[in-house]
Design a protein with these regions (language model features):
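Conserved N-terminal alpha-helix of the aminotransferase class I/II PLP-enzyme fold
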Residues: 12-77, 90
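Conserved PLP-binding catalytic core of the aspartate aminotransferase-like
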Residues: 277, 281, 293-330
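Short acidic loop-to-helix transition motifs that present clustered carboxylates
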Residues: 65-68, 92-93, 114-117, 176-181
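PLP-dependent aminotransferase-like
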Residues: 77-138
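Active-site phosphate-binding strand-loop segment of PLP-dependent enzymes
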Residues: 117-175, 180
């Protein structure tokens, strides 16, 4: 799978067996809030996660997409006069759907196009200025995709954070593909909100996300219920409105995220990150010479997700009796699974946490298939 950062750790598998039943985690809830559970230490874990992401507060959510949707819902209430969200043009489809479901409008920041698809931070500033000129208001939010899902480009958040501070516009970092794989420094990058994915990048069973937010927005996010029944006088003052009481991660998702956290912290240290980048760039250095292959995205790679344009394989598929299915079958014969069936025009892969012997086998498999079909 391309989301290799979501592969469970041995510790997570053990926790999954113990806490896989329904509301298992909530059996230990004494305060009516999942984030207040002390045994297992959910509350301590969330404090540690906030330190790890270098942001003031963290709460679990149903997924990174839900984190983005909630941020936009909160800001829509806080700034009703604003209705435009600025996003990079490599943003995930869920960023757009989050905008749409909140009845907001989108303005895209352009990229440089093929083959690198670079985002220029100055285009964010120009887009903000254009929004002010067109509407007379600031954008409600600026969103940057830290690592995009298609090319694995790493975009530096700091220049965008500086621009957002200059204009006093909230800044949301979508770290679904980076939080848990690369170091995250929300303080340094001046991030107001960060959306992370446990099942994509933090070795948790899905679905689970995280929403990190600065203290400036604490009261907006953690707004307590104030409703009271007219007959029963029922009230639920400890419940958080935006989460319908509690985030829906009551058992396996949250406990596996917690169990994997020590491993996630270790693997995001500089030495481990550098080792993973050596692996992905090792593969690319050995296939870069092949005519009919084009590596898309910025190089050298700073994230292990790769998009390889493969017109040479497409040409083989046109005359092969198995058409586009031939490529998946060739990899399967070599002990490599996970390729999309019928696709020969592009190859997306993620080398994260493969051993060096697996990296070399994968590289050899690509070269072997090329040799078989006289692709040089």
């Amino acid at each position: 799978p391309i989301q290799r950062g979501g592969m469970l750790t041995p510790e997570a598998y053990k926790a999954l067996i113990s806490y896989g039943d329904g509301y298992s985690l909530c059996d230990n809830c004494l305060k009516g809030r999942i984030d207040k559970i002390e045994n297992p230490p959910v509350s301590d874990f969330l404090e540690d996660m906030a330190k790890f992401l270098e942001i003031d507060n963290v709460t679990p959510t149903a997924a990174a997409r839900e984190s983005k949707r909630l941020v936009m819902e909160i800001l829509s209430k806080k700034y009703p006069e604003r209705n435009i969200v600025i996003v990079d043009s490599l943003a995930h489809y869920t960023s757009y759907i989050a905008i749409e479901t909140n009845n907001l409008r989108v303005k895209e920041v352009p990229n440089s196009g093929k083959p690198e698809f670079r985002i220029d931070p100055q285009d964010y500033e120009r887009t903000i200025e254009n929004v002010i000129k067109e509407t007379g208001n600031l954008p409600i939010l600026v969103l940057l995709t830290h690592v995009d899902y298609k090319y694995g480009n790493v975009n530096d958040p700091k220049p965008i954070g500086e621009i957002c501070k200059k204009f006093q516009v909230p800044f949301l970092l979508n770290a679904a593909y980076s939080g848990g794989v690369l170091p995250i420094s929300c303080k340094e990058w001046m991030v107001d909100f960060v959306a992370c994915s446990g099942h994509k990048s933090m070795s948790a069973s899905g679905p689970i996300g995280l929403l990190g937010f600065s203290s400036e927005f604490y009261k907006d996010v953690m707004k307590h219920s104030s409703i009271k029944g007219n007959l029963t006088s029922k009230s639920f003052t400890n419940k958080i409105c935006i989460f319908m009481g509690c985030p829906p991660v009551y058992g396996a998702p949250l406990i596996t995220l917690m169990a994997s956290f020590p491993s996630v912290v270790k693997r995001t240290q500089k030495k481990r990150v550098e080792e993973e980048l050596k692996k992905v760039n090792y593969v690319l250095e050995r296939i870069n010479h092949i005519k009919g292959f084009e590596i898309l995205g910025k190089q050298p790679k700073l994230h292990p997700l790769v998009n390889l344009n493969t017109p040479a394989f497409k040409e083989v598929a046109e005359s092969h009796p198995r058409r586009g299915f031939f490529l998946r079958e060739e990899f399967k014969e070599r002990g490599i699974i996970g390729m999309l069936p019928g696709i020969s025009t592009e190859l997306k892969f993620n080398t994260y946490q493969l051993s060096w012997s697996q990296i070399k086998h994968f590289t050899s498999a690509i070269l072997s298939i090329c040799d078989k079909y006289n692709i040089t």
